[in-house]
Amino acid sequence: MFSITVAEASAKLGVSPARVRQLIRSGVLAAEQVAGIWLIDEKSVEARREHNPGRGRPSARLSQPNISRYLLMNRDHEVLAFRFDASTGEFLDADEIIDAKRAPLSIMSPRGTKASKTALSYWWCHRAIPKARHGIEAKLVELGVADTYDLPFKSMGLSLSDQYWIKPYGSEIRWSDVNYFENDFSEAPVEEWMADVGLDSPDNTSDGVLSKRWVCRNGERCLLKGGTLLDQEPYNEVIATELFSRLLSDGDYVPYTLIEWGGAPVSSCPNFVGPTEEFIPAYYVNEVLPQVPHRDSYRHYAECCVALGVEDIETALGKMILCDDIMANTDRHWRNFGLIRDVETLEYRAAPLFDTGSSLWCRVPTRELAYTPFVVNMRPFYEDADRQLRLIGDTSWLDLDKLAGFPEWASDFLDENPSMYDRTDFIYEGLQKRIDFLHLLFG
């Protein structure tokens, strides 16, 4: 976010204001002048402070053969040009801004004249498979690839979560020829999670720790997602779908089904991003406006959404908060909710609810369930579940009577998983208690 003044940057870096201005002129610090005042990208200041280079002649890296120049594209729109060091995974610059309004949210300065290479690097890092995902280290060795940041380059950075991609500077490749929304992608004939990683596949740009794989079924792009030790997460996704179907409208949530794949139960859901749309995690939406001191995170996020023209955002957040409370979802972090933007019209709307698998006490060992409270620490706004529930204003959509029989349905469904032995009674009671409390709170 471009919000640091020269004086503040001077204090953070331990250098003079004159040196800060020199770093701005040289492009080391991304900054933009507004009303005669330099506003500096906070991430570039932090990166400079961590790097803290010594004195000496500037590096000749830009002339090295491992440095390549690319265009960041959004469908057929050229967004910006950048240089990338394949040996380190570092964005060296973003020196040519072409279409700032279609850039990834949060990397541009307020006037759209500068891009933060630090923010761009952070965005790209979360476009790659995290190193914590099971099997990725062995896959990197198999492919002879040094790090996960290299994987998206093997498929031009293409994704099924947005419309961004990269192409060599001066190339005449067209979006219609390469995108995964319209074109086939690699699908290995084996039911293994890492089979398509490193190939021409959207699996190269799938974020998140749990195993996942994109497949095409009867022309529909679907995401398969596994579970952990007890395989409870895929079942939880289907239970959440049942809950949503009782309380919400069809467009408010992503429907999940349970299938057998690779010898285990996995969840399957259709892609919720359309062929002209991108999903923007709340993390980036949160940086649209500067954080006002003492403003709570809920209010700040809602104000950022309003600034982008999103209608009824507090109603959408209320639906998320209430459903997460019923599901005891402890993993509603700032990357699995957010907004959908149409990259042609630049209109925003709330993203549908998805990724509710880490719920229903699935991370509590069976032997500890008897000593576990039904009320859990919630996210993303408050840990206190009751305090977070009190953020809900509009309840015109809510009919709790539609939840009659839901705890029984959920426990019966979980009984189909042999690993749920000695767990379903606790989950049934927990669901019923949460629903009973909501009746007391909302009537």
Task: Please provide the spans of the model-predicted regions.
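Helix-turn-helix/winged-helix DNA-binding modules
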Residues: M1-F2, I37, N329
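Polyanion-binding surface elements
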Residues: M1-P17
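Major-groove DNA-recognition helix of helix-turn-helix-type DNA-binding domains
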Residues: G14-L39
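A short, Lys/Arg-enriched interface patch at domain edges and termini
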Residues: E42-N66
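Phosphate/dinucleotide-binding and metal-coordinating scaffold of catalytic cores
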Residues: R57-L322, I326-A328, L339-G443
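Canonical protein kinase catalytic loop motif
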Residues: H333, G338
